[in-house]
């Protein structure tokens, strides 16, 4: 570097230290992007800019990356550690050519790789984005615009403290040299690819141009689909067309978002304060997958689970901090109250009525609005379960929005549409007490400003929050596989509902929910809740609880549930101390040590957190339950019984294992339980290990309530084979409530009608009911007998007593 440049950089650093505050994305690039700091690194930037270079230097040093202004040695000669892909702006024009010094460096590096087979330099594309304000519809500025000196100065004043340093995945120059050669053409090709990459990166960060709201409404009113339904409604109602058109405009006003980047930017500061006040930390995983989809031009539809009203804010906040555009969010019309409604609307919410069946005008306008969002490239978010889960379990998917998404594809979208399942988890859900009251019969309180203020008064530290992005689902690939001729149904005007639509949408919905549960985040509270609720008196000594947590951690670490699930990195002792600090347990001391327990109210609330992760332990718990009940059981019998029960667990808990791989997975869990000395194996027979009897009983109890529900329903079917779905649900619910009261089962979902509904559907799908819904006794009877054997004696006696009374 010349002396002049050194002096110039020194002069720039002071004003930049005041004017610039940048956020690196990702926040931990060495780990997230697998950067090897032991291998040579060269940075590629889009434009020649000293300001960008110094901004990168500051971030690189903070992140533990090499200083871009430090030279790199190649064959004993020092060279710059950076290249620019274009000369960039001058005062009155822009030179888009690759700078000669960058071209020369590319050639030197590629030749070095050709001459040295062991060389493997890392090229890291890096761009500095000054602000993320989207453009306005009708403008044609490039997504990534070079700035001359005066423009850069103005930008620094406006957006210097709203800048991001975007660090992209490493490009291996060894790979480039081996596969593409080392001539001048490759250097130019690298520069061209980098320019496209940088432009897409900027689009992914700021999003498409925002429409003028009134122009959008006028455009929708002129669409053939809405115009047609307006004319038909006017004719059917025998009213003036203008009256219906005015009604249509009112519906658009009710639905449409009024997205404001200023609110997002300024609201981010408030949300940052809020999260710091509420949570000790936010844990975000797999965001790089989503960034990649955005940069590749996918239409992204976020489909998170729904635990709390906080989900709306949390996911938008996380996406903004991960360098992505906050999505347009489908929110229930119940949230459109003052002052929250207007704020949510400017934050990206568009509002949807709970039901609009039979309202053709509303349904057509909503469908056209959604199709417009997709066509313009705005990411969209809707909650897969429809409403918040009151039990902590993942609910069955509501398929209305998903069906409209597929219908939007049948309008002829020219970009791939991808669902991104999102698992959102908390160590404390603010509404959990309200949920428990609602499940016990209290009427749901309508959302209002007073409710918000009461919630704000309760703000305190709620432990950790978790946002895990699951495995994406390409709708194009899914349709190609399950409805190969789907493109024949494309119609740009009329909404289509071909024969394949319902089964395909149901299949996508099930896959979507399974991927959400795959991305589960186990945490200190969910694990402690699982252990304590399994204990007979909801109490364990501190030592026993620690050992049980360690048992769970070993299971989750040694047999990972999925590639997207996360497990705490701390040991059992640290997790327990963290959970105790959340102040949810009763802690008593005696001469033998500490006892940790749950009072009755907390026992009910803790079922919510256990239910977040119950699917993780479904199989190991079932294996333990079989061994506990049988005392001695062959592995073949274990495999056979699990094969019989598994379809019901899979449907209820969205487990991802195929039946074809089930035996292998069960074998892995058996091996792990034997390794932990929870059970013993001799000549392919499993039996209890007396030295670890408590641990295996606690593990077995996790699945017990689920098996009790199955036994209840099967007992009813066996006694009354012609019992219909509604009667089975009602009678099973009554018996479950009786069991709950008599045996202290505090889980509100134990007698949830919806869970029995899923069970009925699975019985039918698995052939336990014939086409008329009548029980096939030859199948139901042995299954009922097997389930009965897995019940504790007192539960079995209660079921028999209730059935005798009914007879």
UniProtKB/Swiss-Prot annotation:
A motif (HXXXXD motif) lies at residues 305-310. It is a peripheral membrane protein. Its EC number is 2.3.1.15. It comes from the Bacteria. It is found in: Cell inner membrane. The keyword Cell inner membrane applies. The HXXXXD motif is essential for acyltransferase activity and may constitute the binding site for the phosphate moiety of the glycerol-3-phosphate. This is Glycerol-3-phosphate acyltransferase. It comes from Aliivibrio salmonicida (strain LFI1238).
């Amino acid at each position: 570097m010349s002396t002049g440049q050194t002096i110039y950089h020194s002069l720039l650093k002071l004003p930049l230290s005041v004017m610039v505050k940048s956020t690196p994305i990702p926040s931990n690039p060495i780990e997230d992007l697998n950067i090897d700091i032991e291998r040579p690194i060269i940075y590629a930037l889009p434009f020649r800019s000293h300001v960008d270079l110094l901004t990168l230097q500051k971030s690189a040093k903070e992140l533990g990356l090499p200083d871009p202004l430090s030279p790199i040695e190649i064959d004993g000669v020092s060279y710059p550690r950076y290249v620019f892909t274009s000369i960039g702006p001058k005062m009155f024009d822009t030179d888009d050519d690759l700078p000669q010094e960058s071209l020369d460096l590319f050639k030197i590096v590629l030749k070095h790789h050709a001459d040295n087979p062991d060389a493997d330099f890392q090229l890291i594309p890096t761009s500095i984005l000054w602000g993320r304000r989207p453009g306005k519809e009708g403008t044609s500025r490039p997504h990534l615009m070079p700035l001359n000196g005066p423009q850069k100065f103005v930008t620094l004043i406006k957006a210097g403290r709203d800048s991001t340093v975007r660090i992209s995945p490493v490009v291996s120059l060894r790979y480039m040299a081996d596969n593409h050669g080392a001539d001048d053409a490759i250097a130019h090709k690298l520069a061209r690819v980098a320019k496209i990459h940088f432009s897409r990166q900027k689009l992914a960060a700021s999003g498409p141009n925002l429409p003028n709201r009134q122009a959008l409404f006028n455009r929708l009113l002129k669409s053939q689909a809405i115009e047609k339904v307006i004319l038909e409604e006017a004719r059917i109602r025998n009213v003036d067309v203008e009256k219906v058109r005015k009604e249509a405009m009112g519906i658009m006003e009710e639905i449409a978002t009024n997205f404001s980047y200023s609110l997002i930017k300024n609201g981010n500061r408030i949300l940052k304060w809020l999260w710091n006040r509420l949570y000790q930390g936010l844990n975000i995983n797999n965001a790089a997958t989503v960034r990649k989809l955005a940069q590749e031009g996918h239409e992204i539809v976020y489909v998170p689970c729904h635990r709390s009203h906080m989900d709306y804010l949390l996911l938008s906040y996380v996406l903004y901090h991960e360098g992505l555009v906050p999505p347009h969010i489908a929110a229930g019309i119940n949230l459109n109250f003052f002052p929250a409604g207007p704020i949510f609307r400017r934050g990206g919410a568009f509002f949807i009525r709970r039901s609009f069946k039979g309202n053709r005008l509303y349904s057509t306008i909503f469908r056209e609005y959604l199709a417009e969002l997709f066509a313009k490239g705005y990411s969209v978010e809707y909650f897969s379960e429809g409403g918040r889960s009151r039990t902590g379990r993942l609910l069955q998917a509501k398929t209305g929005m998903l069906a409209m998404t597929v219908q939007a594809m049948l309008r002829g979208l020219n970009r791939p549409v991808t669902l991104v399942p999102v698992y959102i988890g908390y160590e404390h859900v603010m509404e959990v007490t309200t949920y428990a009251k609602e499940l016990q019969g209290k009427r749901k309180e309508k959302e209002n400003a007073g409710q918000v203020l009461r919630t704000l008064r309760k703000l305190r530290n709620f432990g950790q929050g978790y946002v895990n992005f699951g495995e994406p689902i390409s709708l194009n690939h899914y349709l190609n596989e399950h409805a190969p001729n789907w493109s024949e149904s494309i119609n740009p005007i009329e909404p289509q509902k071909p024969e394949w639509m319902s089964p395909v949408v149901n299949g996508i919905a099930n896959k979507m929910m399974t991927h959400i549960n795959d991305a589960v985040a186990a945490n200190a509270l969910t694990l402690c809740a699982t252990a304590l609720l399994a204990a007979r008196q909801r109490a364990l000594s501190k030592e026993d609880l620690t050992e049980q947590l360690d048992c769970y951690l070993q299971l989750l670490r040694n047999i990972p549930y999925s590639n997207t699930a996360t497990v705490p990195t701390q040991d059992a002792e640290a997790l327990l101390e963290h959970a105790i600090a959340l102040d949810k347990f009763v802690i008593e001391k005696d001469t033998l040590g500490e006892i940790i327990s749950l009072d009755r109210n907390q026992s009910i609330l803790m079922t919510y957190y256990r239910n977040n992760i119950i699917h993780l332990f479904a199989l190991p718990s079932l294996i333990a339950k079989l061994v506990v009940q049988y005392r001695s059981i062959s592995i073949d019998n274990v495999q056979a019984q699990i094969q019989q029960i598994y379809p019901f667990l899979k449907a209820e808990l969205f487990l991802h294992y195929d039946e074809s791989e089930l035996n292998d997975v069960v074998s892995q869990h058996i091996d792990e339980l034997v390794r932990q000395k929870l059970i013993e194996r001799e000549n392919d027979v499993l039996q209890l290990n007396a030295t670890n009897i408590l641990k295996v009983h606690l593990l077995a109890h996790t699945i017990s309530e689920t098996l009790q529900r199955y036994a209840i329903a099967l007992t009813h079917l066996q006694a009354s084979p012609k019992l219909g779905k509604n009667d089975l649900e009602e009678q099973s619910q009554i018996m479950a409530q009786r069991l709950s009261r008599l045996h202290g089962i505090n889980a509100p979902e134990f007698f949830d009608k919806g869970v029995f509904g899923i069970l009925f559907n699975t019985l039918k799908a698995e052939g336990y009911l014939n086409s008329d819904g009548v029980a096939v006794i030859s199948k139901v009877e042995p299954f009922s007998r097997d389930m009965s054997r897995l019940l504790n004696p007192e539960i079995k006696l209660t079921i028999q007593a209730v059935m005798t009374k009914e007879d």
